[in-house]
A protein has these predicted regions:
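A short acidic (Asp/Glu
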Residues: 36-37, 59, 132-137, 161-163
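Conserved Class I SAM-dependent methyltransferase catalytic core
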Residues: 81, 88-152
Length: 172
């Protein structure tokens, strides 16, 4: 959890009623932003909701610090071959599939814990790919005694005929 040297700058021209609003929209690398927020909101946040990448093998590429535009990054990063085929993914075959995802999540959850008030809560959306691993690191960071429940919601109503009274069409 190294400190960040980054700062937040308001975009007044892109804001609606900037001087009177009590809300913030923040865009940037979420780990850097969390570290910046920690400076002023340490122990003050009542609720955090995060919806991280689900680690399906095709939903994101690691180590993007967003210091370049998307097109610059894609052009310079070697993610695609000359035919436009993606070369860099966190695929299950790379041998570090779960480890890469957990290494991305762990520092973010640690900083998020610093933001939470004593009676604060965190909600995390996830699917079946990483729910067990996410539960383990959350137990380590937040304490297993603080876990309340997994909330299961149906993504889309689509009754299946392959299992009587059971459905696998849900997220957590």
């Amino acid at each position: 959890n190294a400190p960040t040297t980054k700062t937040l700058r308001p975009c007044r021209e892109e804001s609606v009623d900037f001087d009177n609003t009590q809300n913030l929209y923040i865009e940037g690398d979420n780990l850097d932003v969390l570290k910046i927020l920690r400076e002023n909101y340490l122990g003050k946040v009542k609720m955090i909701y995060i919806d991280p990448p689900y680690n399906t093998g095709n939903d994101f590429v690691y180590n993007d610090d967003f210091s370049q535009t998307s097109s610059e990054y894609i052009a310079e990063s070697g993610q695609f071959d000359s035919d436009g085929n993606r070369l860099v993914l966190n695929t299950e075959s790379n041998g570090r599939f779960h480890t890469d995802w957990l290494n991305m999540m762990y520092p973010r959850l640690k900083v998020a814990k610093d933001l939470l008030s004593d009676d604060g809560v965190i909600f995390i959306s996830i699917d079946e790919n990483e729910i067990e691993n996410l539960k383990k690191i959350c137990d380590e960071i937040y304490g297993a005694q603080n876990f309340v429940s997994s909330i299961i919601w149906e993504r889309a109503f689509s009754p299946k005929n392959d299992a009587k009274y059971l459905s696998d069409s849900h997220d957590y």
